Structures are given as structure tokens and as C-alpha cells.
Amino acid sequence: MSAFACSAVAAPARGAIKANSSSVCAIENGKAVAVGTSKQVGAFKPVFAAAKAAKATTFSISCSAASDEVPDMGKRKLMNLLLLGAIAGPTIGAGGPFVSFLVPPKSGGGAGAGQAAKDAAGNDIKVEKWLETXKPGDRSLAQGLKGDATYLIVKEDGTLEKYGLNAVCTHLGCVVPWNQSEGKFMCPCHGSQYDRTGKVVRGPAPLSLALAHVNVLEDGVVAFEPWTETDFRTNTAPWWK
């Protein structure tokens, strides 16, 4: 069985906020259970509590495999919970808008009217505040179209990229973390990889990550809008239409 060590870091941070998955081996009825038992463990509670205390609005996630094996289905579900649960943490108790993040979307795309990007507390993201903590090269998750976890990208000049990337892997729907050291999005479930623009560079994922337009409204709110034109990475029609 593959082991993963995952950490969630909140900003503004009061020290690192971490959760180690080594004590968890499976998901039982949607909840983490301890190795060899059916007793539920509170592996995520310290992350949620610390994030709430820090009044964090952005999170970065890092994961590293303890072996090169492909994680089993329990690990896959656990990874999704860790990646998105860290974002949902401040609002789980109140049943806030990020609770839906705990269930991977059935579709990787997004269609319909543009909508405000939401932060970890479920509030509209204001570009000025976001850029105070998200530095050049940053790729952090926000709630996007259809509630999908979507990366906002900060360019090297410190401004927001004009597109966002749907974080759902096009293989089997895992949430794909950004690997800063490798400069790629690397899926922990079956090894698919995507470059900085979300273009697939290694299977088994068959397609690139879905795109969404990113606009800044007059009041400074960041908004996502559906991407319906040609995919600039492949020069083809968008598969997520």
C-alpha cells in the first residue's frame, strides 16, 4: 500500500498547519478510519481548527509519496479529502458553501453564467487581497464554475492569469495538486501529469485540464466565466463544452 504525507499551509499563517495521513488507511462510509480498526479518527480536525483560528483565506497543498506505487482507492479518496477538506475546513461546522468540495464533481468542465470566485470562507475573492498572500507563480484553489475546485494562477509580474484551471483530473476525477518543485500538476492517484498551463503531458489522463476565463470586475471581485472558444494549448475545440 502506498503512503502519502500531506500538509496544508494557510495564509496568513500562524505557523504551518499540517495533517499527516500516515495514521489513516481507508475511507469508511465517507469518513477516515484508523489502520486495522473501524474507529473513526480525527485526522483532519487539527487542520480545520488551526485554519479557522488563523482566519485563513488561501491554502497551498503539498503531497509527497512515500513510495512509487499507485495509491489504492482508499488513498485516492483520502487525498481528495485532504486537498479539498483543507479548503472546506473553516465552514464545515456551519455547512458552508465549500462543503460540496468534499465530493469530487462528476464533470470536469463548467458551463453557464460567470460567477464570483469564492475563497476558503465562502466569500467573494477580491483581487487585491488575494495578491497580498498569493505571490508570483502561486497556484491556489478557489471555488469555481459549478462548484469545481479551480486554480487561480499568479503570473510572474504579480497579476492574475486570464484563465483558471479546473483541478479535476480528466482520468478518474481525482483532485490534482500543483508540484512547485517539478513545475507540474501531478495526480497522486494514477500518475497523470499536466504542465503549467494544465496541458496533459503524461497519461493515463486523456485530456488537458478544463479552462475557465478569469476576469476582475469593477469592484475588484474575481469572477470565472465559461471558456467556450478554442483551447489555446491544443488548438482544438474545448472538450468540456
Curated annotation (Swiss-Prot):
An annotated GO cellular component: cyanelle thylakoid membrane
UniProt cross-references to InterPro entries, sorted A to Z: Cyt_b6_f_Rieske, Rieske_2Fe-2S, Rieske_2Fe-2S_sf, Rieske_Fe-S_prot, Rieske_Fe-S_prot_C
Entry-linked SUPFAM superfamilies: ISP domain (SSF50022)
This protein's UniProt keywords: 2Fe-2S, Cyanelle, Disulfide bond, Electron transport, Iron, Iron-sulfur, Membrane, Metal-binding, Plastid, Thylakoid, Transit peptide, Translocase, Transmembrane, Transmembrane helix, Transport
Cleavable signal peptide: none
Transit peptide: 1-62
Note: This protein is 1 of 2 subunits of the cytochrome b6-f complex that are encoded in the nucleus. The Rieske iron-sulfur protein is a high potential 2Fe-2S protein.
UniProt protein name: Cytochrome b6-f complex iron-sulfur subunit 2, cyanelle
Membrane topology: Single-pass membrane protein
Description of how the protein assembles with itself and partners: The 4 large subunits of the cytochrome b6-f complex are cytochrome b6, subunit IV (17 kDa polypeptide, petD), cytochrome f and the Rieske protein, while the 4 small subunits are petG, petL, petM and petN. The complex functions as a dimer.
HAMAP family registered for this protein in UniProt: Cytb6_f_Rieske (MF_01335)
EC number(s) stated in the UniProt entry for this protein: 7.1.1.6
Record note on cofactor: Binds 1 [2Fe-2S] cluster per subunit.
CDD domains: Rieske_cytochrome_b6f
Catalytic activity, as annotated: 2 oxidized [plastocyanin] + a plastoquinol + 2 H(+)(in) = 2 reduced [plastocyanin] + a plastoquinone + 4 H(+)(out)
Binding, [2Fe-2S] cluster: 169, 171, 187, 190
Disulphide bond pairs: 174-189
GO MF annotations in UniProt: 2 iron, 2 sulfur cluster binding; electron transporter, transferring electrons within cytochrome b6/f complex of photosystem II activity; metal ion binding; plastoquinol--plastocyanin reductase activity
Keyword Methyltransferase: no
Task of the protein: Component of the cytochrome b6-f complex, which mediates electron transfer between photosystem II (PSII) and photosystem I (PSI), cyclic electron flow around PSI, and state transitions.
